[in-house]
């Protein structure tokens, strides 16, 4: 096996861009991010099929990325991405949910003859950090198979795990979460949601002594 630094041109993303027409992709990932999907969207269009194993206890907020994905969220394309991703999954993918947590991820590419050509394992979840697009906090270990024997071993692990699970498309937590993000929110809900976000955790700001000093009638201020 070879270790991947997941920086520069030695990233999981670069390995997955080897997708060609007729390739299949199998993913077992602790997390799934819309922005990881966006980074591979064009390549994924060439897949003939995809299999995805996700943890059923993964928080749905992970779909919108982590702190490092703030600039991507600010592009305000999450709703469109959710629709596109859901359409892609319903069209060619099968999804299975694992009741336990996944502590490492496995990604396997197979050619048109269904032979594994690329296989990765380790801290390579289907997120921007896992693909090497954004920095990842802490240390991680990602391995890529360098021989057909090594790739076949990871492929067998995925196949055995998959055979023990039941597929959930078109239903399932991931599909439902994507549908929720993609749905149009009623206009009358936006204003109270904004107020709740702005005022949450700010009870002390409405305290009388914070607004005006009860003893003097003057609020102490500072000019910088």
Can you describe what each PLM-predicted range is?
Residues 1-222:
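PLD/PLD-like phosphodiesterase catalytic module centered on the HKD motif
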């Amino acid at each position: 096996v070879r270790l991947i630094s997941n920086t520069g041109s030695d990233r999981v993303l670069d390995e997955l861009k080897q997708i060609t027409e007729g390739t299949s992709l199998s993913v077992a990932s602790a997390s799934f991010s819309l922005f990881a999907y966006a980074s591979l969207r064009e390549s994924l269009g060439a897949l003939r099929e995809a299999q995805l194993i996700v943890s059923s206890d993964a928080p749905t907020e992970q779909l919108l990325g982590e702190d490092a994905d703030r600039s991507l969220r600010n592009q305000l394309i999450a709703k469109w991405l959710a629709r596109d991703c859901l359409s892609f999954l319903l069209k060619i993918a099968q999804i299975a949910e694992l009741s336990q947590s996944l502590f490492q991820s496995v990604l396997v590419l197979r050619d048109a003859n269904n032979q594994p050509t690329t296989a990765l394992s380790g801290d390579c979840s289907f997120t921007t950090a896992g693909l090497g697009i954004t920095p990842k906090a802490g240390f991680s270990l990602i391995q890529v198979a360098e021989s057909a024997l090594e790739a076949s071993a990871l492929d067998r692990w995925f196949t055995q795990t998959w055979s023990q699970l039941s597929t959930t498309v078109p239903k399932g937590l991931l599909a439902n979460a994507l549908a929720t993000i993609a749905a149009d929110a009623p206009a009358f809900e936006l204003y109270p949601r904004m107020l709740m976000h702005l005022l949450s955790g700010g009870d002390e700001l409405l305290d009388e002594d914070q607004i005006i000093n009860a003893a003097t009638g003057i609020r102490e201020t500072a000019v910088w």
